[in-house]
Amino acid sequence: MAQIKITLSKSPIGRKPEQRKTVAALGLGKLNSSVVKEDNAAIRGMVNAVSHLVTVEDVK
């Protein structure tokens, strides 16, 4: 299955609690931290909810 790299590019400080929890659930803590996750519908939905805070790249 394909994988995606998710990087926290903007701070969740001052955002809604749901968005902060989503960032934490993705495994992102500090600014510019990155995680590699499987590309599935659940992860894509979480990324879509905080798309203004993260950047996404395909991993080959």
Swiss-Prot record:
<dbReference type="InterPro" id="IPR016082">
    <property type="entry name" value="Ribosomal_uL30_ferredoxin-like"/>
</dbReference>
<protein>
    <recommendedName>
        <fullName>Large ribosomal subunit protein uL30</fullName>
    </recommendedName>
</protein>
<dbReference type="GO" id="GO:0003735">
    <property type="term" value="F:structural constituent of ribosome"/>
</dbReference>
<comment type="similarity">
    <text>Belongs to the universal ribosomal protein uL30 family.</text>
</comment>
<dbReference type="GO" id="GO:0006412">
    <property type="term" value="P:translation"/>
</dbReference>
<dbReference type="InterPro" id="IPR018038">
    <property type="entry name" value="Ribosomal_uL30_CS"/>
</dbReference>
<dbReference type="GO" id="GO:0022625">
    <property type="term" value="C:cytosolic large ribosomal subunit"/>
</dbReference>
<dbReference type="Pfam" id="PF00327">
    <property type="entry name" value="Ribosomal_L30"/>
</dbReference>
<keyword id="KW-0687">Ribonucleoprotein</keyword>
<keyword id="KW-0689">Ribosomal protein</keyword>
<dbReference type="InterPro" id="IPR005996">
    <property type="entry name" value="Ribosomal_uL30_bac-type"/>
</dbReference>
<dbReference type="InterPro" id="IPR036919">
    <property type="entry name" value="Ribo_uL30_ferredoxin-like_sf"/>
</dbReference>
<comment type="subunit">
    <text>Part of the 50S ribosomal subunit.</text>
</comment>
